[in-house]
Amino acid sequence: MADLKASVEVVGEAWKKSAYYADAEQWTFIFWDADQPFRPFFDRLDLRAVLELACGHGRHSEIVASKSSSLTLMDIHPENLDSCRVRLASSGNVRFLTNSGYDFAPVEDGSLSAIFCYDAMVHFSPDLIASYLVDAARVLKPGGRALFHHSNRDADPDVHYGQNLQARNRMTLARFAELADQAGLMVMDARPIDWAGIAKLDGLTLVRKPRIHHRVLRSLRGLFASRSEKAPRHT
């Protein structure tokens, strides 16, 4: 727990007060235009009860609020949520939660149909991503999905992420898939993303919480296959 809190401090401090939030507004279209890679992935989410992780100043939240029955905005910085409250003042279906930086508490077990996180997890260290994936399996409903925009750069772990290209932390599509599997989530789709003119700098991964734990499902399939092989064959 202490190590996770230390990682949150390293990753989160730079974004408490940053010019990024104002600058990023002009690039919001990248995530929502139909000819961009993000939109087809997002359209596969069930938005009845959706949470945006690391919502910042709400540039995506503003778009999603009108599409969702229930939208939860989550951020480690209360100041960001204050900005979102102003921005979404006319939306009656939104709740605002400050979180730890490594899990979805206080969100209730099995209460979300979807989670998404854009342009934030690219900076998260692997231990934080692993922790979030484990808790995503807790808060998602069976069959619920989560869409994560993350780094695809196998960066030097001994170098501060802020010194990397576009401040990307250490993560790859393959490693993300491993962490999702360990958390009990199934990868539905994943692809590399070009960012700031840098080929395949990022990854986009869509995961699903199975209605039956995928490891149990594998065991059952193995059992049925074994029984089928042992069954007498009639000629």
Question: Which functions belong to the PLM regions below?
Answer:
Residues 114-127:
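A short SAM/SAH-binding and catalytic strip from SAM-dependent methyltransferases
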Residues 1-49, 53-106, 124-130, 135, ...:
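Class I (Rossmann-like) S-adenosyl-L-methionine-dependent methyltransferase catalytic domain
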Residues 61, 109, 119:
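Conserved acidic functional residues
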Residues 105-115:
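A short acidic, Gly/Pro-enriched loop at the edge of an enzyme's catalytic core
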